[in-house]
């Protein structure tokens, strides 16, 4: 056959279908990793995918309730082609959230483990060249208690926008946020994991075709909250250059606390540990198996509305703590002092954040579609752990939101608006204003669209529910079947906005509706079937809540309780 035909054959093998002839192998600081090439329909250049790349040592044994340590080096080529286990969590809750939020066609089989500090990488770069593509690091949501990286497939965003997408995991629940409020277990382990993942990106992403000098962190819900915490944290300074918080910011009262003792005591007691001292609790909890801690976790009834107990003694979240390390002070103090990373920042909310998914998961009794004033008042008080509204202010709040109508269906809708404003809308505007006032480029959006991929159980009237923008951000119409042209175009536009922002710190670009910067005029973008600029998002609501919180503070005895908004 001669030599030349053989060379031509091997070249043909390289270039047919755009696949290189052998799977990608990349050097990391700790050792080589083997990935796989995946093609997206309509693209000749495949995306190299690496799944389950370790960014820290497994946080087991004495490393439980301890800062993450660097991974041990390896001398072989590590196979990183299968999904890593998600961090320990309630398997049912994790499964439900993953199925509701995934942009994939098929649900991936879920596994859970305390050994979970892994990330996934999607890179469209030609790995033989020294590409320096923008990097987008995704932090998943799930109330800091459930969720995982692999629910979100970065393939479409990576291929369409020529960016490196990294999805990271971090410890959750007891494992991620158990705190005694002192040196024995400071807490915020999950946030320290996020910082460790960003450090790993700085040290390694160049070999995957990414630019460590252009890293955007983005996340949704507790992921958006985490992004907002990292913007405020001195530990994350210079580890990223732009940030996007979708439906969650550092002033989300439910997810942050100064008062950790009662939660620590509850976790210890439910685990059969003595609570005599912090050291005793931590030592005992470190001896528990993963399954035993999971049992404790299930008893905590995390992310559930407690309709029976005293709202002031109900702890449906294992929150971030003001620990003096990740957060030197309370977020509102850091914001007021303007002592944070003034990177370009996109902050957004969805039109109906409390539309269906959150009330359903938390067990709010709203299914019959009606709500009277008395029940609304009771639900608001039962929601104290989430809203932090003092009991004597509840009638004022209920009257303001629900008082204008006798229609019980309308009252239910207004109650959902109230919940959305307190948890998402008002904190998002306050954070955006603080960011703007510190001199950082800031952009706001409100997302209003009903994806075709959502659960059939969801009422038709819910448009722009919590999490709905994820389908657009991660290009679901290019991975799942059945999207209309309108939905496909919406996803193209949103991916373009997000990636332009990752590239330039500004979402605007050719062929896109103009997105005004959030300045003193408070222009923002309404994103949906028709996308257009508007002004002063939640302006009246922010004023109402600011007045209410001021009254609350004035009435409170001198013992200061941590208050948001």
Swiss-Prot record:
Q: Does Transport appear among the keywords?
A: no
Per the UniProt record, the source organism is: Mus musculus (Mouse)
Gene name?
A: Ces1d
GO terms, biological process = acyl-CoA metabolic process; acylglycerol catabolic process; cellular response to cold; circadian temperature homeostasis; cold-induced thermogenesis; cytosolic lipolysis; lipid catabolic process; positive regulation of transcription by RNA polymerase II
The GO terms describing molecular function are:
all-trans-retinyl-palmitate hydrolase, all-trans-retinol forming activity; carboxylesterase activity; carboxylic ester hydrolase activity; fatty-acyl-ethyl-ester synthase activity; sterol ester esterase activity; triacylglycerol lipase activity
| PTM sites of type N6-succinyllysine | 382
Protein name as annotated: Carboxylesterase 1D
Signal sequence bounds? 1-18
Q: Where in the cell is it found?
A: Endoplasmic reticulum lumen; Cytoplasm, Cytosol; Lipid droplet; Microsome
- State the tissue distribution: Highest expression occurs in liver with lower levels in adipose tissue, kidney, heart, intestine, lung, testis and thymus.
**Which EC class does it fall in?**
hydrolase
Q: What is its EC number?
A: 3.1.1.1, 3.1.1.67
